[in-house]
């Protein structure tokens, strides 16, 4: 499943990308809350109170110093991975449904029932009449 996820991220058709954009936009608030309110506190618990959102490197000194805020980037990456995983699962489900629909056996055409009883009797009569 992880290899399929890697392949999905590495390549995809336009439909996959469209689904990703739509689902990503719809789940942005939910995923952001998930990361900020649930995942980060758990990570913080195991890292001794480390908060990713506050991580950064001050490039200059002063009140309005330029900051290289790599903590926010880490949070954005986590958000992206969660959204991409959800989209991957959705596309995988859609592909499975399409595959099941394609593999459904089509109704076999009705077999030729052959001549009716009346037709058979007529053939026998004609054969007897010729002899």
UniProtKB/Swiss-Prot annotation:
Protein topology in the membrane: Multi-pass membrane protein
Presence of keyword Coiled coil: no
Classification via SUPFAM superfamilies: Gated mechanosensitive channel
PROSITE patterns linked to this entry: MSCL
Annotated S-S bridges: none
Pfam families: MscL
A single GO cellular-component term on record: plasma membrane
Gene3D superfamilies linked to this entry: Large-conductance mechanosensitive channel, MscL, domain 1
Gene Ontology molecular function terms on file: mechanosensitive monoatomic ion channel activity
Keywords for this protein: Cell inner membrane, Cell membrane, Ion channel, Ion transport, Membrane, Transmembrane, Transmembrane helix, Transport
Superkingdom in the source lineage: Bacteria
Job of this protein: Channel that opens in response to stretch forces in the membrane lipid bilayer. May participate in the regulation of osmotic pressure changes within the cell.
PANTHER family named in the record: LARGE-CONDUCTANCE MECHANOSENSITIVE CHANNEL, MECHANOSENSITIVE CHANNEL MSCL
Protein name per UniProt: Large-conductance mechanosensitive channel
Organism (species): Dinoroseobacter shibae (strain DSM 16493 / NCIMB 14021 / DFL 12)
Organism lineage string: Bacteria, Pseudomonadati, Pseudomonadota, Alphaproteobacteria, Rhodobacterales
């Amino acid at each position: 499943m992880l290899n399929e996820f890697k392949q999905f991220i590495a390549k995809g058709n336009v439909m996959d990308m469209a689904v990703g954009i739509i689902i990503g936009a719809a789940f942005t608030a939910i995923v952001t809350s998930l990361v900020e309110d649930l995942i980060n506190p758990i990570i913080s618990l195991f890292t001794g109170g480390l908060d990713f959102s506050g991580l950064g490197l001050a490039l200059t000194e002063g009140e309005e110093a330029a900051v290289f805020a790599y903590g926010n980037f880490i949070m954005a990456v986590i958000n992206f991975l969660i959204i991409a995983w959800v989209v991957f699962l959705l596309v995988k489900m859609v592909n499975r449904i399409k595959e099941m629909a394609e593999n459904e056996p089509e109704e076999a055409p009705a077999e030729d029932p052959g001549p009716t009883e009346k037709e058979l009797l007529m053939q026998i009569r004609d054969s007897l009449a010729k002899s």
